[in-house]
Amino acid sequence: MPMPPQCASSKPPSPPPPPHPHEHEVGDDMAEEAPPPPPPPKLLYIAVSDAAARRAFRYTRPVLQGTLQLMGCKARHAFKISKRVFNVMRSEFLDASKSDTADNEENAPSLVKDVEMLKPKILEATLSSIPFELYKTQTTIVVSREKFLSVVCDALSSYKYVGPNQKADFLLACRIKERKESVTVLLCGTSGCGKSTLSSLLGSRLGITTVVSTDSIRHMMRGFTDEKQNPLLYASTYHAGECLDPVAVAQAKAKRKAQKLDIVSHPNTNEGRDDTSDDKAHHGSSELPPRTELIGSKQMAIEGFKAQSEMVIDSLDRLITSWEEQKQSVIVEGVHLSLNFVMGLMKKHPSIIPFMVYIANEEKHMERFAVRAKYMTLDPAKNRYIKYIRNIRAIQDYLCNRADKHLVPKINNTNVDQSVAAIHATVFSCLRRREAGEQLYDLNTNTVAVVNEEYRNQRAANSLGSKGMFQLIQRQGSSRNLMAILNTDGSVTKAWHVDKNNGNGSLDGTSSDKSTKNPMYDTFGKAEPVNLQFGSFGISAWMSDTGGTSHTGSVDDLRADGIETGGRYYSSCCSSPKVSDCPSKELMEDDYSVFGSEEDADDPPDAGTDEDLTDEERDMHEIEAGSVDEHSTKSDEEYDDLAMQDVMENGYWSDDEQAASSTKNSSNQEKNIHGAADGDVVDDEGSGNDRFHHNLAFFLKMSKKVAATELPCA
């Protein structure tokens, strides 16, 4: 029924509310303002795929930073290089992905479009319903191994990192990080020598998260037996000899000695030796001397240490087998790593790299025990470590003698940062040689001469590199790049040819022959600071003409350098001949003779002495520079602040002290230049003096410009 007209108009519609006084103005402003652009997509993962592999490995910024630190980059540089790599990947492949997906924009769903914004080539990304998996897909790009290596090497070059085989080193570090290979570092040593501190710092430096102590293995084994049943397992290593029977130990030692004498006297009479062994088996110990001399307390401490170590080493053997099957890198430290048992482990496990940690000075060793006791004292009544210090030192003497016999590198741990830097450089050098197909353990000699040689080369390289700073120079009228060590007076200690065109910092093999014939007596017209992997330890990789690993060059290469007594001019040869007519060869041999030869290492020193070197010589050896900043566990925010501060203050300089020392020396060197110009210093060589002052003036000029030079964008 239609509504009457009066009913329809009885309730007129309410008038619209009065407009707000500022409504039109706000509306006009919103109409004029465009919607804010969507935030750029994040890049959290770089999936690196090999041609033959079916699965890609995801790199995050912290993982890439740890990989760069493993290959020897400084922590602050590793942080900034990883940031630069992710920025380059994001900018390059974001533009490429936009052009690739423009053709399929009409047919592709919006979700798939968002997923492919960051992927240059998506394999077959399934749109999962799990939010986290979808988020990872949206923030991941997939690149080839070659492209990834190229971007990282370019970033290394932008931060002035040069190396003889930089690309191969990064690829080796990637294989360790991706668990395609593994390494097992063993830190042997007695109580109180700093093994636990070294292992934790070394794990942070190498990016190894698994750090195991043999004490934890012993504690685990204690849960399966009672103290009354096995008191030896519940004792500490330095007084484990108290749980042994002195008479039984003396008889066992006499029996072993008699067997050795029998083998020496009858080396080829196998049949007669079998009959003798049968007779001994029937008579038991009746043929032993009736009055066996008892051994002393120190020897009993060593025998107790060996007995407890033998109990722990079997469990460690099974653990290392499991780690190698899983390709898991690990650091093992502990007093139970007796060198005899370590050599047995190396026969079965090729991933092991051993080191012997010790404290040469007994007073410093005792001071370490003062903070470990319940009461901070050196009183033997209240400090059990001081009470058994004789046993602890006896065990250390035994381990040092065995290390000399098996050529295991010995680390005098007077400075933790220096020890970590030396071990880090040695471990990576051993990984290079293992990658080349060499075996670290020599089965014929029962030694690890390769590891010992690498450690000696690292020490020699650090001694050479600490004399100056690293510069990338060019001679006047030449286009060849040279990585040189410059002294503060402008002279060149040593130089190597660098092929800068390939972007990887590789050596130019065609120019190595010329370097031995044309030492650097000429002036140079260009110089810029550079960085080396492992700092001054990294020079060990430059000791060969071919740019290979450090084993191709040795300490003999350093001895044969043409170094004059005055120290003004130095040879630029990459690897000098074994025989040299330089007048300072004898002096250089004296400097490096402290390392000892392999023949000397086969003869262990007397048990009553710690070493054949004096404390002053040890202190001189231990003056080393760390290869990586010790504050390697800083957060991203702290590294951002550090990066800004590093760019503004230091330019290309890698350390604050390096920049400060250069500016400090500048004023002193300028005074020397003016004094020489006024005639205070007279040189008989004429033109040689002019070349020297030209190099010195140019070096000071370049050092002043270093602080004003800015790093590339990080």
From Swiss-Prot:
Biased composition (Low complexity): 1-11
Tissue specificity comment: Expressed in roots, leaf blade shoots, leaf sheath shoots and panicles.
Pfam families assigned to the protein according to its UniProt record, in alphabetical order: AAA_33
Compositionally skewed regions (Polar residues) per UniProt: 659-670
Residue spans of biased composition, Basic and acidic residues class: 271-285, 618-636
Acidic residues compositional bias, start-end: 595-617
InterPro entries: P-loop_NTPase (IPR027417)
Null mutant phenotype: Strong reduction in seed phytic acid with a molar equivalent increase in inorganic phosphate.
BP term (GO), one: myo-inositol hexakisphosphate biosynthetic process
Gene3D superfamilies xrefs: P-loop containing nucleotide triphosphate hydrolases (3.40.50.300)
Region (Disordered): 1-42, 259-293, 595-689
Function: Required for the accumulation of phytic acid in seeds. Phytic acid is the primary storage form of phosphorus in cereal grains and other plant seeds.
Protein name per its UniProtKB record: P-loop NTPase domain-containing protein LPA1
Organism: Oryza sativa subsp. japonica
Gene encoding the protein: LPA1
